[in-house]
């Protein structure tokens, strides 16, 4: 059974649009997800206390072993991630969680200007 991490954009937000997009994408990807073991992580809130990143917890282990990771729905991308911390609180300690993610239905708040090195 494949292990899949879903970064759930509907956890920790009152934006109904995030929930609608997520549900639609899950329906469209049911052929892929139905036979998988899923673990959900939030994109809008911290997933674990900082101390948990230094321990080998089941959640951390699952993330390392996941066959693939999906981020589905909402406007997460930005030229400057530090300015959108309430939308997607990524820091250096947990940024590895998002390595090699597949994004579907993810928009951007791109405006004029350069993409910061931190955002890359």
What positions do the PLM features span?
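Aromatic- and Gly/Pro-rich donor/ligand-binding loops
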Residues: 2-120
């Amino acid at each position: 059974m494949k292990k899949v991490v879903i970064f759930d954009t509907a956890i920790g937000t009152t934006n109904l649009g995030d929930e609608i997009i997520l549900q639609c994408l899950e329906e469209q990807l049911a052929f892929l997800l139905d036979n998988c073991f899923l673990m959900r992580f939030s994109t809008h809130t911290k997933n674990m206390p900082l101390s948990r990143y230094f321990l080998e917890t089941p959640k951390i282990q699952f993330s390392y072993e996941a066959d693939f990771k999906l981020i589905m729905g909402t406007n997460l991308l930005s030229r400057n991630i530090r300015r959108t911390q309430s939308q997607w609180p990524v820091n250096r300690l947990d940024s590895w969680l998002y390595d090699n993610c597949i994004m579907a239905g993810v928009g951007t708040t791109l405006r004029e200007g350069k993409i910061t090195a931190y955002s890359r």
